[in-house]
Amino acid sequence: MGDLLSNSEFFKKLGVDSSNQWILYDEQMEMFFKFLSGNITDANILTERQVLEREEMQRRGEWLSASDRELKLLQIEAESPGLLNYKQQDVDALTMSIEAIEDASRDYATLLEDMMTTKHSITKHLGEVECVTAELQLREKDLIAECQSKAKQLEELQQENCRLSAEAKKAFTAPQLPPLFMHQLPLEQYFHKCDSFMQYFTLYVKENFKIQDYDEFQSAEEDLGREKAKLEDLERGIQFYALSYIRTKAKVKATQCLIDQLDLGKIHCLSLTDMAREMHDLQLLNDYQLSNTHDTLLNDLTIHIQQHTQRRIELVLYENTKLKLERAVRRHESDKKLTKIISDALSNAELLWIAIQLDCDKKRNCLDTSEELRDQAQATWQRIQTMRSINASYQGICAQFVQEIANLLSAHLGQNIKATEAKACLFEYEKFGRLLSYSFQSMLNRKSCAAVQDQLAELKRLEQTLRPFVYDSPLEQPMFENVRYLSAIYNVTQQQTRLDESGRSLRKDFLENVVGRIERDKLYRYSVVLWIWFLTEPQRMMHAIDEVKKAAAAVIRPGGGLHRK
């Protein structure tokens, strides 16, 4: 018995000193001590801390009696059914679930940091693209201003050519004073007058018919080619950035899908307050992330549409400017050719008329019987015969002249003019001159400046729109320190209007597709709020499950196999 008491684990747990044993050394107590050592474990022995806590609770009056403990246990069971039946395995499972949720939260925070980094990089890249676009817009404005100045210069040159043509026509059609019929004068004076007239005529043609070569049009065309190449490079760059933007958007959407896959209905929390607080934090974080993602995507889409519209406008303006320059160059070339033809024709006609007058004067002086006069008369007769032969047969210079006029008229009129008769060519030329005069009159009446007037009207409208931003003072004068912010203010106003419209449409879609569906569809409402009822109101959850079972039983299911009537 002494060995039993000295080697008993029961007394060691109780802290009894084996050297001072007060237990009776009786063999009948052996079974009693064995029973006690088999039934008393570490869980049944109060520790010193537990004893102190009990004394403290008794001192504060918080220690419950047996009946009070039974009532408290019933209350806890009523508030949380099955809570007292949980074992250590259930507690371990809930602990593992909480650890898994914490790991998922850390992964979600890391993913959010990556998304913010990606957002900052995309914003920086879009800012660089906006800077490049603004630079190209400035270049486009400079090019348009240069084209407008070239068009104005060309218009002034055409007006000057029209004036000079009218003066030349007046000079050759009006009667000359003094008359050129000087057959009463001697031949020496007549020849002297003819030489002076030819010199005057040559000087007049050189001074008034100046044909200039406009090399600057070629340089402008080369500049347009270079600008077109730059615009094409910019378009390819925008396509590349749009592809990268689509990839980033797909990555964001995939991440959102992964986040949506988290089934919060399977999460069981040990404490309702902790679960509610965690749910509130996750909801705030999710709402903030969704708002940031929506704003980012909306801004990116707006900027992309704006860039696409600006690029289309730039291309249209470039094509219109190119067509105008081509028409101006063709008109200039046609004016040069027509000026040359008219000048050559007038020169030939004047020379022929002078030769005829000389022949007439020499015929009138036929009374002179000198050898020189006889030689002159023979030469004049030969010239007259040559002119008659040329008039009789459309060969030589006249045929070449008629053929050249026919070719030029065909090129200008877009019709095939046959060089059979000079009258037909003259008729077509007269028709062409009439159309040309109509074109000159329309140009002088400013009908060709309709596009410029429309642009001026648009500029005036923009001026009236932006005037409150410029004249923001009691005085009627612009505040120059704020002028550089006007474009940004205008763009922000437009973006705010578009954002308001998008917000209204988004709110309308949410009310129609989410709130309206929750109010109309009972089963959809149960699927949304069932996990909330599971945590807060179990009775409503059981009622919802019964309603779903009734709805499922009401659905007609097709039977399998053959059925006998």
Swiss-Prot record:
CC per GO annotation: cytoplasm; HAUS complex; microtubule; spindle
This protein's record includes keyword Cell cycle: yes
One GO biological process term: mitotic spindle-templated microtubule nucleation
Keywords: Cell cycle, Cell division, Coiled coil, Cytoplasm, Cytoskeleton, Microtubule, Mitosis
Glycosyltransferase among keywords: no
Disulfide bond positions: none
Compartments reported by the entry: Cytoplasm, Cytoskeleton, Spindle
Domain of life according to the entry: Eukaryota
Coiled-coil region list: 135-171, 212-241
Any one GO MF annotation of this record: protein-macromolecule adaptor activity
Assembly, per entry: Component of the augmin complex composed of dgt2, dgt3, dgt4, dgt5, dgt6, msd1, msd5 and wac. The complex interacts directly or indirectly with microtubules and is required for centrosome-independent generation of spindle microtubules.
Family designation: Belongs to the HAUS3 family.
Note: The name 'dim gamma-tubulin 3' derives from the decreased gamma-tubulin staining of the spindle pole seen following RNAi-mediated knockdown of dgt3 in S2 cells.
Record's function text: As part of the augmin complex, plays a role in centrosome-independent generation of spindle microtubules. The complex is required for mitotic spindle assembly through its involvement in localizing gamma-tubulin to spindle microtubules.
Protein name: Augmin complex subunit dgt3
Organism of this sequence: Drosophila melanogaster (Fruit fly)
Taxonomic path: Eukaryota, Metazoa, Ecdysozoa, Arthropoda, Hexapoda
